[in-house]
Amino acid sequence: RPGRLDVKIKLDRPDAAAAAEILARYLDGRTPLTTGGVDAAEFRRGLIDAIVERLYARSDANRFIEVTYAGGDREVLHVADFVSGAMLAGIVGRAKKAAIKELIGGGERGLRHDHVLSACAAEIAENEELPNTTNPDDWARISGRKGERIVFLRTLVGSRALNPS
């Protein structure tokens, strides 16, 4: 179409600081909160910190997949290695939807920590299907890893193994 630009721009996955900035755009001053008497700005910052901490912790709970490279080296990738702006938007959207459903059901108005933590868990669970591709080239593209070819994938969520060969 005239005037349309078909330019692809590669963006790296956000680190924890960038994720916090992205989340601040979605959890702005217009988002109703159930603060329990805490300053709204401080509470909002706490929600953002809770999401970032849940996604970026290099803990056993966040181990996502183990890749084996052609040279035999192995690497464990965590949830943080797959975070995207879309995932962050999805978490906030899920949390807001949960808060709205609760309000409609007679609950309190506003977003709470349990809403965002449940939304994180749901978004991570949905993304557990991500490694189901068996093409190593697709996998390298999805994970954003460059360099040596991936020859074997083992999901650490549900202990399934995928062999791309």
Predicted feature descriptions by range:
Residues 9-12, 32-37, 136, 140-144:
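Glycine-rich loops and low-complexity Gly/Arg-rich segments
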Residues 67-165:
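C-terminal engagement/docking regions of AAA+ P-loop ATPases
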Residues 1, 24-28, 121:
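A generic structural signal for secondary-structure junctions
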Residues 12-87, 97-106:
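Conserved C-terminal "switch" segment of AAA+ ATPases
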Residues 1-13:
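A short helix-turn-beta junction within AAA+ P-loop NTPase domains corresponding to the substrate/partner-engaging
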